[in-house]
């Protein structure tokens, strides 16, 4: 779906693969793989495409959305807020893990599992959001992580 939307955006702007690739700073071969769906598109590249072509994340990652332009804008703003909040929480999680001497290789540790899950959320899953309910669910998830961190940080200080 993302590849098809990138290809559609490129064609809308009447650009060749080479021209589009140069604008977003990738090779033509990479663009071809993204458009054909043989390679996954990084969230960083989605960010660049959205900025260079003034489109929303939903335009790139979502198809057949049933939102009017105002709702689309509101959803895009909420996605940005949740993404930024998630990044801040992830930073706090990493600091907490460091302060507790938790090894990043310990995949059985719940703090590592939580940070991996949060990283997936802010780097991938957030771009697949198509409804306000989904973004609210992610926001609630962030609330839970924040509460756990606050409790753990207070115990650490006490």
Curated annotation (Swiss-Prot):
UniProt DNA-binding residue ranges: 17-36
Stored InterPro entries: Antitoxin_epsilon/PezA_dom_sf, Cro/C1-type_HTH, Epsilon_PezA_dom, Lambda_DNA-bd_dom_sf, PezA
HTH cro/C1-type domain: residues covered: 6-60
Conditions for induction: Conflicting data is available; found to be a member of the pezAT operon (upon ectopic expression in E.coli); in S.pneumoniae strain 0100993 is found in a monocistronic operon.
Keyword annotations: DNA-binding, Repressor, Toxin-antitoxin system, Transcription, Transcription regulation
PROSITE patterns given in the database record: HTH_CROC1 (PS50943)
Keyword Transcription regulation set for record: yes
GO molecular function, one term: DNA binding
Alphabetized Pfam families for the sequence: Epsilon_antitox, HTH_3
GO biological process: negative regulation of cell killing; response to toxic substance
Protein purpose: Antitoxin component of a type II toxin-antitoxin (TA) system. Upon expression in E.coli neutralizes the toxic effect of cognate toxin PezT. Represses transcription of its own operon, PezT acts as a corepressor, considerably increasing repression.
SUBUNIT field: Probably a homodimer, forms a PezA(2)PezT(2) heterotetramer. The heterotetramer is much more stable than either of the proteins alone, and a specific mechanism may be necessary to liberate the toxin.
Name this polypeptide is given: Antitoxin PezA
Species whose genome carries this gene: Streptococcus pneumoniae serotype 4 (strain ATCC BAA-334 / TIGR4)
């Amino acid at each position: 779906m993302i590849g098809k939307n990138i290809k559609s955006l490129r064609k809308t702007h009447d650009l060749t693969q080479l021209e589009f690739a140069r604008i977003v700073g990738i090779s033509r071969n990479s663009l071809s793989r993204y458009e054909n769906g043989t390679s996954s598109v990084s969230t960083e590249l989605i960010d660049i495409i959205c900025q260079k072509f003034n489109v929303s994340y939903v335009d790139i990652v979502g198809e057949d959305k049933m939102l009017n332009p105002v709702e689309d804008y509101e959803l895009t703003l909420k996605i940005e807020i949740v993404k930024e909040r998630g990044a801040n929480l992830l930073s706090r999680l990493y600091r907490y893990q460091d302060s507790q001497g938790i090894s990043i290789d310990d995949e059985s540790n719940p703090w590592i599992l939580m940070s991996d899950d949060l990283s997936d959320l802010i780097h991938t899953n957030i771009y697949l959001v198509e409804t306000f309910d989904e973004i609210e669910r992610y926001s609630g998830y962030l609330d839970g992580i924040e509460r756990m961190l606050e409790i753990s940080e207070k115990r650490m200080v006490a």
